Amino acid sequence: MDNYKIAETETFSKKIKSKKFNHLYSKILNDVYPIFRNNPFFGVNIKKLKGKYKEIYRFRIGDYRLFYTVNEIERIIFIINIENRQDLYK
């Protein structure tokens, strides 16, 4: 079985370079992306969203949430956004 490829959206790329999130990027590259390449659907920190966001998954990284979608046909994961948990529920 081929591994999934990872594509970062422009929104995510800009946000991860900001001071608020840049400390997470090495963790995402070294710890999260290897998990995604093997199986982006199942894991302790992976949850599929519901309702109008049912095509989006979220990955928990401590107090932060990484959001992504998966194109199963082309086997590509699109990293959409990252947010601090407390900012999501304001």
Task: Identify the meaning behind each predicted range.
Residues 1-57, 72-74, 87-90:
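Basic, Lys/Arg-enriched alpha-helical interface segments
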